[in-house]
Amino acid sequence: MATPVPEAVTVPTCWVTAVNGYFYASNAGSATLSEFQDSLTGQLSLAGSTGTDPGTVDSAGTPSGTFLYVQTGGNGIVDEYQVATGGSLTEIGSVIVAGAAGGEGIVAF
């Protein structure tokens, strides 16, 4: 049986996005992304955690698997991350979207 993920990392979770065999859960309550790795057996294991701006709600990965964009509805900010081959995230910037405070929903292409 899989080891439970620590509560501080996961509560509350709003959205999960898959990118190249990794899953990124948006944790609105802790302003983090939980990174999970998929195994060949279908079990997920916690691979790490990355900080975001407050109010993490939705996320979207690019089709190439190179970038992950995270909407933080608290202040209408979109955080931008580069996805490494091993699934780790590097923050590359953030953008304030006018009128997007409290918003939900994001798409990447």
Question: Each PLM stretch: what is its role?
Answer:
Residues 1, 35-44, 80-89:
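Short loop/turn segments immediately following beta-strands, especially the blade-tip
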Residues 18, 38, 61-63, 83, ...:
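Generic beta-strand structural signal
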Residues 25-29, 70-74:
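Conserved beta-strand positions in repeat-built beta-propeller and related beta-rich domains
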Residues 71-109:
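Blade-level signature of beta-propeller repeat domains, shared across WD40, Kelch, NHL, RCC1
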